[in-house]
């Protein structure tokens, strides 16, 4: 196989893992003019997803998907990535000069250490997006940021692949990869839990369509926070309304005890950030933090 600099601009692509991410990125690469030659899909759901997003692409065993591709996309769970790479390297499945890309946010290119003798080109391209595994995601990829980590000589090519998929490449240093991923997981994944808990509480209040009440408020809060950071803080904690917060905590003990620890932890973090940013005066902040500490001790 020729080197990346000698190859035609269009690649034969193998997709390992037809989960929500892999199938969508395969479709995005197809739309960009690349040729997906094979996909691995184990579960019935992944085979159906591959058929929907990658019509006509044959489902193959992983070694066959990898060996026939210029560009390999490893879209598999973080915890099995290193093991799979080591196995493919040990069996000689990789080809010299092959582009091998994984989609993990937590890993950079050090996960390819076991394949160093394979002379492959390692790429870590992580889309900062939540996926449904449908064609809706193709539109969401437009202007979606991708965390890019690779060797210096492959950086232009990695960034070009991201742009071809409709994304915006953002360089992430190898030693900052885990910090990058922790930030995204905390901001997006925990947001789902937070909003779901808020919807549950509104249900307790007798509101039939919690999402209708929350959507304008949450959209405004998110937009304000992205523009202003901690200056966007509002509400009883940021105002120092200790009585209101105490009433909330007492209510949660009765109607939603499973939500109470989350409320306490986030209220404490909010109070600390409000203090540091000057939104909350020291005396009010101390009183708020003392209340929260007392309630946590009584959990």
Where are the language model's segments positioned?
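NAD(P)-dependent dehydrogenase/reductase Rossmann-like domain
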Residues: 274, 282-299
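Interdomain hinge/lid region at the active-site interface
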Residues: 223-283
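Short, hydrophobic beta-strand segments that form beta-sheet elements in well-ordered domains
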Residues: 38-41, 100-103, 148
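Short, well-ordered alpha-helices that flank and scaffold nucleotide-derived cofactor binding pockets
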Residues: 23, 27, 31, 52, ...
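NAD(P)+-binding Rossmann beta1-loop-alpha1 motif at the extreme N-terminus of oxidoreductases
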Residues: 1-67
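Internal alpha-helical scaffold of NAD(P)-dependent oxidoreductase catalytic cores
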Residues: 8, 47-53, 115-119, 136-227, ...
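Rossmann-like NAD(P)(H) cofactor-binding subdomain of soluble oxidoreductases
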Residues: 44, 58-136
């Amino acid at each position: 196989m020729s080197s990346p600099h000698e190859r035609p601009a269009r690649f034969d692509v193998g997709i390992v893992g037809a989960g929500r991410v892999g199938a969508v990125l395969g479709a995005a690469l197809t739309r960009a003019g690349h040729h997906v030659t094979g996909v691995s899909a184990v579960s019935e759901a992944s085979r159906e997803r591959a058929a929907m997003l990658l019509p006509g692409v044959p489902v193959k065993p992983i070694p066959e998907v990898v060996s026939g591709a210029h560009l390999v996309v490893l879209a598999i769970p973080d915890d099995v990535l290193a093991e799979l790479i080591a196995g493919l390297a040990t069996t000689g499945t990789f080809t010299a000069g092959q582009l091998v890309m994984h989609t993990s946010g937590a890993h950079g290119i050090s996960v390819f250490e076991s394949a160093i003798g394979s002379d492959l080109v390692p790429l870590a391209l992580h889309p900062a997006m939540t996926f449904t595994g449908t064609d809706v995601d193709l539109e969401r990829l437009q202007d979606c940021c991708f965390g890019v980590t690779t060797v210096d000589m492959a950086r232009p090519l990695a960034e070009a692949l991201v742009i071809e998929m409709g994304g915006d490449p953002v360089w992430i240093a190898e030693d900052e990869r885990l910090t990058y991923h922790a930030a995204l997981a905390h901001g997006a994944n925990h947001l789902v839990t937070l909003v779901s808990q808020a919807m549950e509480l509104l249900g307790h209040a007798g509101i039939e369509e919690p999402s209708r009440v929350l959507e304008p408020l949450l959209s405004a809060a998110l937009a304000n926070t992205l523009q202003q950071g901690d200056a966007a803080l509002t509400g009883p904690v940021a105002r120092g309304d200790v009585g209101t917060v105490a009433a909330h905590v007492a209510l949660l003990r009765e109607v939603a005890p499973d939500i109470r620890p989350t409320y306490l932890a986030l209220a404490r973090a909010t109070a600390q950030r409000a203090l540091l940013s000057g939104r909350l005066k020291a005396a009010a902040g101390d009183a708020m933090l003392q209340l929260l500490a007392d309630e946590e001790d009584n959990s």
